[in-house]
C-alpha cells in the first residue's frame, strides 16, 4: 500500500481516524540512535514499505519494495511511492539496483499520468502468454491518482532491471471512480490445472478473484468475504493465494489465502491473517470462519510469499514489512532512512493440535553471518540477574540468542524474561509465560525516543504482545534475533512467532535473563554477535 493510499485507508475506517492520522502525522521525531540494522533490508535513504513478491531469474533473486524518495519527516504521508529493485543470490546479502518503476510518469501514448506506483506483483511469463517475449517479467501494480485506484501493467525484457509501460493502461480501471472504492494490491499466479492466470485483488472488506489468459484482459469470477470482515479485520490488503503441502504430504496439498488485516477484535495491530481452504479454479472456500495469524507480533505486515524452487509445494519463503499502520506515521525514524523488512523465512504447513498451521523460521543462510557463540548451560535462574552467569562480552547491537528453558519439579518461577537493549533505565523484555503457555514482547519502556509519540499511536505501540504456544509443556525453546531496532522471537521451531520494532537508547546493549519469581532452569543459552555485513551495497 502506497503512502497516498494510507490516507484513504485511514479515511475508509472512519472519519475520526482520518483526523487522528492528520494530527499524528504532522511530524515524525528522529530516533536517538543512528545505527542502521545490520542484517535486515533497509532503504539506502528515505522511506520504504511493502515488499513485492520476489522471483528467481538470471541466477539471482529479484525483490522490489515500495519506496518514497520524497519522504519528509515533517509530512510523512506525502510524496507517493515507486518500486525499488534489489537482487541477491542467497536472500541474505542484497545489492541495490535502483528505482525501476517511477511514480507520476506519463503513460504512452496518451501521456496521462495515472498516479504513483503502489503494491502489485511480478511474474516471469515463461510461455509468452502476454506477447512481450518468452520469460518477460510482467508486473501488474496499483496506480492511484486523485484517490482513484486502478491496475496498470509494465513489462521487462531485461530480467526485471527496467520496465516499459503497457500502452493499454490501465488494464483494470476502477469500477466506480466517483465513489473511489478500495481496488488494489493485485497478486497474480499461474493456475496449472486451469491453464490461466489468477489475480486476487483487495476490495475493501473482501477479496475479488479474476482470471486471464494473457495478463492484459481480466474477468471477474468470485469473491471471498470473511465473516464480519469490516468489523473484525478492517480494510483488507495485500492478498496472497497459494498451495502448500500439509506435513510435507503431497496428497494433502492445501490452499492458503493470506492477507493484511487489522486485528481489532483480536487485540492486535495490523498483521497477516490467513485461512486454509480449497480453490476450485474460480473461488476460494475457507475451512474455518475465523483466521489464524502468521505472526503474533505488532510489526509483520504486507507479507509476500513465494515458491521454494527446490521444494515447490513442501515449503515457501516469506518476508514482510516491519511496521504497523497504527503508528507508522508517528515512529521516531532515523535521520537518513525509514523502514525495514523482516528476515526472510521458510514457511511450512504443519498439523498442530489437529489444525493446519503455518510455522516459520529464518532461512538457513542467516546462520553464516553470526560469529562463534558464547554459551552457558544448566543454570538455575532467579530474579537475580547474576544467577544466570551469562558470558561476558555481550555488548553488540545485533545478535542472536538461542535458549532452552524448563520449569522442572521444584521450580517456582512462572516466567523467563530476557531483558535486552538495557541501559539501566530503559529496556525491552521478551520472554515466555509457562502458566499461560505463551511468549511475550514488552516494549513500553524500550527507549526515550518513543515517549514523544501521540497518545493513540503510543498506546498501540506500548501494548504488550503475546504469542500462544500451541503445544505448551514444561520446556520451551526460544530463538531470538535482535538487530539494532528490531526483535523477532521464534518459539519451538516457529510454532509461534513475535516480530516487533524497538527503539533503544544509544549504546543500550545490556542483556539479563531472570525469572519473575522463584527459580527456573536455563538448560542452555548461547549468544552470537553479528557485525554489519554491508549486505546492501551499490551495484
Locate predicted features.
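Beta-rich accessory regions
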Residues: 248-250, 278-290, 294-301, 306-539
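Beta-rich carbohydrate-recognition and catalytic domains
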Residues: 28-185, 190-232, 245-296, 320-378, ...
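Beta-strand-rich binding-surface signature
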Residues: 185, 238, 477
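N-terminal signal peptide
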Residues: 2, 16-31
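A positional/structural detector of protein chain ends, strongest at the extreme C-terminus
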Residues: 1-4, 539
Amino acid at each position: 500500500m502506497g503512502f497516498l493510499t494510507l490516507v484513504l485507508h485511514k479515511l475508509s475506517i472512519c472519519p475520526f481516524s482520518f483526523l487522528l492520522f492528520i494530527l499524528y502525522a504532522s511530524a515524525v521525531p528522529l530516533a536517538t540512535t543512528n545505527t542502521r540494522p545490520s542484517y535486515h533490508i533497509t532503504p539506502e535513504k528515505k522511506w520504504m514499505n511493502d515488499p513485492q513478491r520476489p522471483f528467481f531469474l538470471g541466477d539471482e533473486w529479484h525483490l522490489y519494495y515500495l519506496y518514497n524518495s520524497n519522504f519528509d519527516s515533517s509530512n510523512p504521508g506525502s510524496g507517493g511511492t515507486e518500486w525499488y529493485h534489489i537482487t541477491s543470490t542467497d536472500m541474505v546479502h542484497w545489492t541495490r539496483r535502483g528505482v525501476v518503476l517511477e511514480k507520476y510518469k506519463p503513460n504512452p501514448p496518451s501521456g496521462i499520468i495515472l498516479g504513483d506506483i503502489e503494491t502489485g506483483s511480478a511474474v516471469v511469463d515463461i510461455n509468452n502468454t502476454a506477447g512481450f517475449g518468452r520469460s518477460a517479467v510482467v508486473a501488474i501494480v496499483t496506480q492511484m491518482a486523485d484517490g482513484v485506484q486502478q491496475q496498470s501493467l509494465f513489462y521487462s525484457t531485461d530480467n526485471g532491471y527496467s520496465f516499459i509501460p503497457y500502452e493499454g493502461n490501465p488494464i483494470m480501471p476502477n469500477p466506480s471512480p466517483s465513489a473511489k472504492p478500495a481496488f488494489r494490491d493485485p497478486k497474480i499466479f499461474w493456475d496449472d490445472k486451469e491453464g490461466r492466470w489468477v489475480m486476487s485483488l483487495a476490495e475493501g472488506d473482501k477479496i475479488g478473484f479474476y482470471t486471464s489468459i494473457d495478463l492484459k484482459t481480466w474477468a471477474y469470477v468470485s469473491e471471498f468475504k470473511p465473516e464480519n470482515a469490516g468489523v473484525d479485520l478492517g480494510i483488507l490488503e495485500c492478498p496472497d493465494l497459494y498451495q502448500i503441502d500439509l506435513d510435507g504430504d503431497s496428497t494433502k496439498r492445501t490452499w492458503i489465502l493470506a492477507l493484511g488485516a487489522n486485528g481489532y477484535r483480536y487485540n492486535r495491530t495490523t498483521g497477516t491473517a490467513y485461512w486454509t481452504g480449497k480453490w476450485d479454479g474460480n473461488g476460494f472456500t475457507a475451512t474455518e470462519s475465523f483466521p489464524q495469524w502468521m505472526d503474533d507480533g505488532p510489526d509483520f505486515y504486507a507479507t509476500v510469499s513465494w515458491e521454494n524452487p527446490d521444494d515447490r509445494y513442501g515449503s515457501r519463503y516469506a518476508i514482510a514489512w516491519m511496521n504497523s499502520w497504527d503508528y507508522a506515521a508517528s515512529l521516531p525514524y532515523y535521520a537518513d532512512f525509514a523502514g525495514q523488512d523482516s528476515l526472510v523465512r521458510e514457511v511450512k504447513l504443519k498439523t498442530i493440535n489437529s489444525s493446519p498451521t503455518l510455522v516459520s523460521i529464518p532461512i538457513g543462510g542467516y546462520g553464516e553471518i553470526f560469529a562463534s557463540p558464547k554459551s552457558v548451560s544448566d543454570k538455575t535462574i532467579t530474579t537475580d540477574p547474576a544467577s544466570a552467569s551469562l558470558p561476558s562480552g555481550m555488548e553488540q547491537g545485533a545478535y542472536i540468542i538461542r535458549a532452552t528453558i524448563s520449569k522442572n519439579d521444584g521450580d517456582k518461577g512462572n516466567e523467563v524474561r530476557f531483558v535486552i537493549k538495557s541501559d539501566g533505565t530503559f529496556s525491552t523484555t521478551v520472554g515466555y509465560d509457562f502458566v499461560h503457555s505463551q511468549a511475550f514482547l514488552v516494549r513500553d519502556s524500550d527507549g526515550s525516543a518513543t515517549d514523544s509519540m501521540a497518545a493513540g499511536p503510543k498506546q498501540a505501540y506500548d501494548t504488550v504482545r503475546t504469542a500462544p504456544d500451541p503445544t505448551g509443556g514444561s520446556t520451551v525453546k526460544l530463538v531470538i534475533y535482535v538487530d539494532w531496532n528490531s526483535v523477532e522471537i521464534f518459539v519451538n521451531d516457529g510454532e509461534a512467532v513475535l516480530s516487533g520494532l524497538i527503539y533503544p537508547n544509544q549504546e543500550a546493549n545490556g542483556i539479563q535473563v531472570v525469572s519473575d519469581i522463584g527459580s527456573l532452569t536455563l538448560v542452555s543459552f548461547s549468544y552470537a554477535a553479528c557485525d554489519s555485513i554491508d549486505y546492501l551495497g551499490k551495484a
